[in-house]
Amino acid sequence: STIGYWLSQKTNYPFFDADKHLEEKENRIISDIFANEGEEYFRDLETKYLKELSERQGIIISTGGGAVKKKENIDILKQNGIVIFLDRTIEDISRENHENRPLLQNIENLWKLYDERINLYRKYADIIIKNDDDMDVVTDRIITTLKGKL
């Protein structure tokens, strides 16, 4: 989300965090949805709101890490956009605050999810960008790479 925001600032394209968009539309936080309705219900909502966002032109969308679990989500995003995977080490990911991410509450689960998803991220990405530097450098990498794709 942070990189998406920075990219938006540098390119003047509007930025949408898909998880925040979902929370605003549902008037609840994701952890409550998981706790009360479960992951499958959340994933269906995620798809619904990704469809809504992807109908817009010229925007930047940041998705949650699990969006890749449903191929339909990837197909939706690729219809009008370019899917960028920000490649980070699991060590870097583990240092973040994950209090609002129900599936990332312990390190064992983080490793499990990483192992489940990493190949999907790489498979579905149109572009893979190393996210191993400060925001300014990473956003410049994205912009430089996109210039060759647009």
What are these regions (language model features)?
Residues 6, 10, 56, 82, ...:
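NTP-dependent small-molecule kinase module
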Residues 14, 18-78:
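ATP-dependent small-molecule kinase phosphotransfer cores
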Residues 26, 34, 46, 54, ...:
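Short, flexible helix/strand-to-coil boundary loops that buttress conserved ligand/catalytic motifs
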Residues 45-49, 72-73, 109, 116-117, ...:
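Short acidic active-site motifs
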